């Protein structure tokens, strides 16, 4: 017996059409009607659940002379009519670990509520209401601007809307085609020894001089060699106090013992920073292909992310965040995206002035994958965008849309 035949039997007993039935077995949604019960692992005596999805009825059309409903209410009704049932989404999240992890990354609030059906429904509907309200506000703003398009102030606002749309589209394209650019890049550290004291040095070709913290200079027993005549104030993004300069000390890099000078400066969270003076003096090469600092044909591998002490990365853990498009939070210093409320493949509300409708798009992904997503209540365009963002992975695309 196939799942399709089982739905027909349920229809004969309950008068519920197969299109409204969601068969659930072991918290997993049976989406392929062509599979047999044996193929999905259902045996005699097993209990199945049937979840019935009911669509919200459309609001009656008002007469031309009567008052119209608020735009936010209309948007909410449209979303309720086209969006999937919250319980269906919840069961799909619980039944697939990959989808659950994708939702946890993109919508933590919704993922945390997945274990409670009522709480999940409340969170889901609240998010839908917020999105409908924002969309209504955008539509009202566009209508106001289009009412007087020749007003110079309106022209500036329309130009800003177009610019913001271009920025959002650029962000979505980058996240779809170059997602690696939004990851956090590990800084370049190498293990060194200064006067017999082992430490990790930060390689920075953008620094003019090699810098050491006072605590590190004390640990290396070279604080007594600091020439205070070279003290002063360093000015850049902020200010830092320069205590002085150690003109020459021995540093071990790999198996080489090299002379090096250090500028002792306060206010740095890094013990030792190898600057351009040291790198040029010894003709060092930062070889990113090999992942090593090459000096005199000897390659010293950079430390991996797991090998870098946590206190050296604390400055980036608490970095300020900048609000991006669609709720993205971007690190102000590293540029890493730490939270994305809505995936790049999800539906986004357009704020541009209305234009002619685009022709129907063809997709390079299987029609079966598109059909499975549209069965959950999403449109074909949303399904294609989500599949593009997930590189064809069905579960990942559903995770983007939820």
From Swiss-Prot:
One of its GO terms (molecular function) is aspartic-type endopeptidase activity. Pfam families: Asp_protease, Ddi2_HDD, UBA, ubiquitin. Residues 1-57 form the Ubiquitin-like domain. GO terms for cellular component: cytoplasm. Residues 347-363 have a biased composition (Low complexity). Gene3D superfamilies: Acid Proteases, DNA helicase RuvA subunit, C-terminal domain, Phosphatidylinositol 3-kinase Catalytic Subunit, Chain A, domain 1. The active site is at 204. Probable aspartic protease. May be involved in the regulation of exocytosis. Acts as a linker between the 19S proteasome and polyubiquitinated proteins via UBA domain interactions with ubiquitin for their subsequent degradation. Required for S-phase checkpoint control. Belongs to the DDI1 family. This is DNA damage-inducible protein 1. The lineage of its organism: Eukaryota, Fungi, Dikarya, Ascomycota, Pezizomycotina. The gene is ddi1.
